[in-house]
Amino acid sequence: MLQYRIIVDGRVQGVGFRYFVQMEADKHKLTGWVRNRDDGTVEIRAEGLEESLKQFLKAIQKGSPFSKVTDVKVEETKELDGFQKFNISY
């Protein structure tokens, strides 16, 4: 199991991107959360198997139909939080 901290930049707020991220996380059996940040980016914490996280990242980089992803920063964190499911945080 791994945990990634992901920051997504572009047109990713107000376009259903967090819902898209949650659906992709569920599809890949990941746990964690996604939230909007004050600077216009979206932050994601995702835990799961390495291959599942890689597939999830591919989907995130592609984006949802109404989003336009311009940059994705990924950092593997040292800790696991043991999330039970994947949530949208407000």
Swiss-Prot record:
GO terms for molecular function: acylphosphatase activity. Its EC number is 3.6.1.7. Residues 3-90 form the Acylphosphatase-like domain. It is an enzyme of class 3 (hydrolase). Signal peptide: none annotated. PROSITE patterns: ACYLPHOSPHATASE_1, ACYLPHOSPHATASE_2, ACYLPHOSPHATASE_3. Keywords: Hydrolase. The active site is at R18, N36. It catalyses: an acyl phosphate + H2O = a carboxylate + phosphate + H(+). InterPro entries: Acylphosphatase, Acylphosphatase-like_dom, Acylphosphatase-like_dom_sf, Acylphosphatase_CS. Belongs to the acylphosphatase family. PANTHER family: ACYLPHOSPHATASE. This is Acylphosphatase. The gene is acyP.
